[in-house]
């Protein structure tokens, strides 16, 4: 049967039949006659513009009744093997049970059912037996078709059973339109028994619990939601929270599902999507075509490939596609009239024309509306929006009852594309969503989206190119695009261009993805307020239009300019989400980000708006994400860096505005570095591409988009174009990208390293050096950069160090060599200026050089207690303070010796103390000084660790203590007017030691004499003993292993000799 014929017929038949069928399908599923309800619904549904039943019947040359044994089908309402049978049974049974004439009402459903029940083993979802092959043949469209064909079966099933019967009429029409095309195109798709079982398992639940729900899409979601409106809302909110995750998940789940159901399709789709970027374009074309095919799978319009991806993705996706496409067909039609109207109304009332009519006429729009709608309507607000739009548009179409029922549906099903699709797609996906929702979202985004969406070969290359999350967002974004008329127009226009230009297409969807994420965030927020949701939808649409146009241009340019492989995956949605979550989370960066956002119209809208939105719902972990996503967005690398150093930069925020990073590090510099970034992106893309050609191409395109966006944003003010590599953690040639660099001072940023900004400078080595230093140097560099006010270049370098090459990435050529040179200079400069800094800090952080022992001890303790890292710079500060103290003591004692006529004994003591101090300073202090320098120099091969420094410092403390004791003694003598005998402490000490001995009288005099004579010497000896003991202990510890080895070496030869 011609698609043209079958689709209208199917649409008509479904539109007319499904309402009736829906009326009774619920009966079959729930045992409750839905006839009245269905009838009511059907009546409004019938009121929806749609092909006449006669046409449907006529066009359904393959009347479901022909293929479907009504009794057979109805007897197997729960026959899970023929999911169609099971689901369709309820539907058909419902139809029949409802008393709907099987030929008219249930024929098509029966046909579906018939395929489902008769062909349960093959589980043909579509009326035509040949559809399975077609479904597979048309993997991209097939996916749509299969979805649609699934939709007819499942559509009928869901429509009659789970889906809200009331909603099915209009949906039926739209769905019919979609389904007709879907049926015709998709013909019959064989759904694996397991998939059918899943469908049955899900759908019956949906039927049971959610039979009133109008959306097939919600059927799976409904299945989840059917339990209670509260749970549904919870799921909806979870889905909203997870929508980004869901995108990532969906990419992965779809990939898995694709592997399951349509692994062949996956291949086909990979090929189709890879070879069919034209088909991706056709996805765009399908947006028009799909106005029928994708119309039925409106939700899938831009993602017909997604549909195919989703379809090939699998049982779960097949479920989702069945369910989705059923929702797509019916619910889509439903949602086109209902969801779309609602959604379109919610997102853009302009788009909301008559979704029922648009569902037929504007199937792509319906798609868009639906996606955008679901985006808008994803939550209870979706209900709200649905109520609004549905009430506005669907009032004639839907009875208030239906609308309330739909409200209970929550339109979780509305986002069935993504969310509904996930729930519908299978709980498998929901679980991943939950997993992503669980908090590994960043990783899920990075790994799942990049790994699963991008990396998983199951996802079609198109999916890879347009990551499933992207695809989903794209799918939804076209819908989201249609969410807002402007974006719909932009999507219609830009997607057409994109369809013409796959790169642009991907870029646009990427943009769409980001916008979709944004829209989702908006829709989430919108869920917070349907009104704001609608305004946001409009804003989103406009924003997306602008962004789409800008980014499509920029991305296409970036694609060309960057010469990036295939698709740089813009995880723009997740990336923006993360980044903007980062900004929003890091309000410090937000000003900069805001400026970047402001500067970047696109990003400013996305980032600013998204930041605003995302501030509330950012699924991305707060700073962690912001740091890693850091450079990529409008954030300047400084921002990323700032994210990394947000705390310190919070203080330095004003001193370190993005542009104030120094003339060196202007966003314009980063623009120049954009060239470097382009090179880096190209290199990274090439590397990633080499690492994962497909994923890397996808990422490349996405990143090309990001790169172009970043360039634009950089121009706007994004200094750092770090294209977030987080998507491709495994593909990241430099596992620790600039983001890490930016964050290397932050340990948590290390965790964030998944998010790699493809910075101008991609430097693992540098990062390592930076990171190593940044830990110790970060504080110093931060303080130094701020406090020392070293040349912006040096500061830049340090910050580059600290912040990773983020600064340098843009301010400096991305060449690692340069960075290394800078780092080297930095290291030297750091140390030197650190010395200066130490001098400054010495007074602040360390006790003023007090010539006496207690201050010295305090200083030591201060060093230990100091919150500062005990790294080379810290120890240098301590050393500097100690040196100054000793020098002070020496000068004081020398002055005293000159000014006062002192006894030779006292002068000897002074000379001894001063000589000891000078010797200590000239030798051990100098050694320690160089050790600290080496510690601060990441390039130092025998680079001592902080522990080494601490150990050496402890050793020095023995000597310092010894010297300090000498000066303390001199100080006591000075207090005693340089009279040794007169020192009361000595007398007391003389007396005090005697009690210690058990024989005080005997020991008294000798001890007294000894102390009076040898007190200074004894103190020195004691100090020496302690020092020697400490040295011995240290040397023993250090050499214990060696000593053991020596002993072994010694004894082994002996043993050998003996042997």
From Swiss-Prot:
It is found in: Cell membrane; Postsynaptic density; Synapse. The modification Phosphothreonine is found at residue 743. Residues 272-285 have a biased composition (Basic residues). Residues 31-54, 245-311, 613-669, 723-756, 985-1025 are annotated as: Disordered. The keyword Chaperone does not apply. It comes from the Eukaryota. Residues 262-271, 747-756, 1007-1025 have a biased composition (Basic and acidic residues). The keyword Membrane applies. Keywords: Cell membrane, Membrane, Phosphoprotein, Synapse. The modification Phosphoserine is found at residues 302, 308, 390, 456, 667, 670, 673, 720, 745, 776, 811, 983, 1012. Residues 245-261, 632-645 have a biased composition (Polar residues). One of its GO terms (biological process) is signaling. Expressed in various brain areas. It is a peripheral membrane protein. It holds the Pfam family GKAP. Interacts with DLG4/PSD-95. May play a role in the molecular organization of synapses and neuronal cell signaling. Could be an adapter protein linking ion channel to the subsynaptic cytoskeleton. May induce enrichment of PSD-95/SAP90 at the plasma membrane. Belongs to the SAPAP family. This is Disks large-associated protein 2. It comes from Mus musculus. The gene is Dlgap2.
């Amino acid at each position: 049967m011609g698609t043209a014929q079958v689709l209208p017929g199917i649409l008509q038949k479904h539109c007319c039949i499904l309402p009736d069928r829906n009326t009774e399908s619920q009966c079959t599923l729930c045992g409750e006659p839905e006839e009245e309800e269905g009838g009511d619904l059907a009546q409004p549904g019938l009121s929806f513009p749609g092909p006449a039943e006669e046409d449907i019947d006529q066009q359904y040359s393959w009347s479901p009744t022909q293929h479907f044994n009504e009794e057979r089908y109805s007897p197997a309402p729960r026959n899970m093997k023929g999911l169609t049978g099971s689901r369709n049974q309820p539907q058909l049974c419902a139809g029949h049970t409802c008393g709907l004439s099987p030929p008219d009402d249930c024929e098509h459903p029966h046909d579906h059912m018939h395929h489902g029940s008769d062909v349960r083993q093959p589980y043909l979802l579509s009326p035509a037996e040949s559809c399975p092959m077609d479904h597979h043949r048309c993997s991209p469209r097939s996916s749509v078709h299969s979805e649609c064909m699934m939709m007819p079966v499942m559509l009928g099933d869901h429509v009659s059973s789970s889906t809200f019967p009331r909603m099915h009429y209009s949906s039926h029409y739209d769905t019919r339109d979609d389904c007709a095309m879907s049926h015709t195109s998709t013909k019959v798709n064989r759904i694996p028994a397991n998939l059918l079982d899943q469908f049955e398992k899900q759908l019956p639940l949906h039927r049971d619990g959610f039979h009133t729900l109008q959306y097939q899409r919600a059927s799976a979601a409904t299945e989840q939601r059917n339990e209670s409106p509260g749970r549904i809302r919870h799921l909806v909110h979870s889905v909203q929270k997870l929508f980004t995750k869901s995108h990532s998940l969906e990419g992965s789940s779809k990939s898995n599902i694709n592997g399951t159901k349509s692994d062949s399709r996956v291949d086909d789709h990979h090929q189709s999507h890879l070879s069919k970027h034209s088909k991706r374009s056709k996805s765009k074309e399908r947006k028009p075509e799909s106005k029928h095919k994708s119309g039925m799978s409106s939700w899938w319009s831009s993602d017909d490939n997604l549909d195919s991806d989703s379809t090939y993705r699998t049982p779960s996706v097949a479920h989702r596609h069945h369910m989705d496409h059923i929702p797509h067909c019916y619910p889509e039609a439903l949602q086109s009239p209902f969801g779309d109207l609602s959604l379109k109304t919610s997102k853009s009332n302009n788009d909301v024309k008559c979704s029922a009519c648009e569902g037929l006429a504007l199937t792509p729009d319906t798609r868009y509306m639906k996606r955008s709608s679901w985006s808008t309507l994803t939550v209870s607000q979706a209900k709200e929006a649905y109520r609004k739009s549905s009430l506005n548009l669907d009032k004639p179409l839907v009875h208030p009852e239906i609308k309330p029922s739909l409200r209970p549906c929550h339109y979780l099903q509305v986002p069935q594309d993504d969310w509904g699709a996930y729930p519908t797609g299978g709980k498998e996906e929901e679980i991943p969503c939950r997993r992503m929702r669980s908090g590994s979202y960043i990783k899920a985004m990075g790994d799942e989206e990049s790994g699963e969406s991008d990396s998983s070969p199951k996802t079609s290359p198109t999916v890879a190119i347009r990551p499933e999350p992207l695809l989903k967002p794209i799918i939804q974004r076209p819908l989201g695009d249609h969410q807002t008329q402007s974006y719909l127009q932009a999507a219609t226009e830009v997607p057409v261009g994109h369809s013409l230009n796959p790169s642009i297409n991907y870029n646009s969807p990427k943009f769409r993805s980001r916008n979709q994420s944004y829209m989702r965030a908006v829709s989430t927020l919108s869920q917070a307020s349907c009104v704001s949701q609608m305004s946001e939808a409009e804003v989103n649409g406009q924003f997306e239009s602008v962004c789409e146009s800008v980014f499509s241009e920029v991305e296409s340019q970036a694609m060309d300019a960057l010469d990036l492989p295939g698709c740089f995956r813009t995880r723009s949605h997740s990336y923006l989400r993360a980044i903007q979550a980062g900004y929003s989370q890091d309000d410090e960066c937000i000003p900069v980000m805001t400026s970047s956002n402001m500067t970047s119209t696109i990003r400013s809208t996305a980032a600013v708006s998204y930041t605003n939105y995302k501030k509330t719902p950012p699924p991305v972990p707060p700073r962690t994400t912001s740091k890693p996503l850091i450079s990529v967005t409008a954030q300047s690398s400084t921002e990323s860096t700032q994210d990394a150093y947000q705390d310190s930069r919070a203080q330095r925020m004003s001193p370190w505005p993005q542009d104030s990073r120094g003339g060196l590090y202007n966003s314009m510099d980063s623009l120049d570095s954009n060239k470097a970034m382009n090179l880096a992106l190209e290199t990274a893309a090439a590397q990633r591409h080499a690492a994962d050609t497909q994923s890397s191409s996808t990422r490349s395109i996405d990143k090309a988009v990001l790169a172009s966006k970043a360039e634009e944003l950089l121009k706007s003010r994004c200094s750092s174009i770090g294209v977030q590599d987080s998507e491709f953690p495994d593909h990241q040639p430099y596992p620790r990208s600039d983001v890490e660099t930016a964050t290397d001072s932050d340990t948590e940023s290390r965790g964030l390293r998944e998010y790699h900004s493809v910075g101008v400078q991609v430097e693992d080595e540098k990062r390592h050096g930076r990171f190593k230093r940044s830990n110790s140097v970060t504080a110093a560099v931060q303080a130094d950069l701020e406090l020392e006010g070293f040349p912006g270049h040096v500061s830049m370098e340090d910050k580059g160090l600290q912040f990773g090459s983020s600064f340098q990435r843009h301010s400096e050529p991305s060449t690692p060599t340069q960075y290394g040179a800078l780092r080297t200079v930095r290291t030297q400069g750091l140390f030197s200026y650190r010395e200066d800094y130490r001098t400054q800090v010495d007074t602040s952080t360390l006790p003023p050089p007090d010539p006496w022992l207690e201050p010295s001890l305090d200083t030591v303790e201060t060093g230990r207690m100091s919150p500062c890292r005990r790294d080379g710079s810290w120890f240098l500060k301590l050393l500097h303070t100690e040196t100054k103290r000793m020098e002070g003591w020496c000068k004081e004692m020398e002055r005293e010796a000159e000014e006062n006529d002192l006894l030779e004994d006292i002068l000897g003591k002074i000379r001894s103390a001063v000589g000891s101090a000078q010797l200590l300073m000239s030798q051990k202090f100098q050694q320690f000084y160089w050790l600290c320098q080496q510690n601060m120099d990441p390039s130092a091969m025998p680079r001592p660790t902080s522990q080494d420094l601490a150990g050496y410092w402890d050793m020095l403390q023995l000597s310092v203590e010894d010297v300090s004791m000498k000066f303390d003694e001199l100080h006591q003598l000075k207090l005693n007017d340089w009279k040794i005998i007169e020192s009361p402490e000595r007398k007391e000490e003389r007396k005090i030691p005697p009690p210690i001995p058990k024989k005080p009288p005997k020991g008294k005099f000798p001890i007294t004499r000894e102390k009076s004579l040898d007190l200074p010497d004894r103190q020195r000896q004691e100090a020496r003993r302690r020092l020697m003991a400490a040295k011995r202990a240290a040397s023993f510890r250090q050499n214990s292993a060696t000593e053991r080895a020596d002993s072994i070496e010694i004894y082994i030869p002996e043993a050998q000799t003996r042997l």
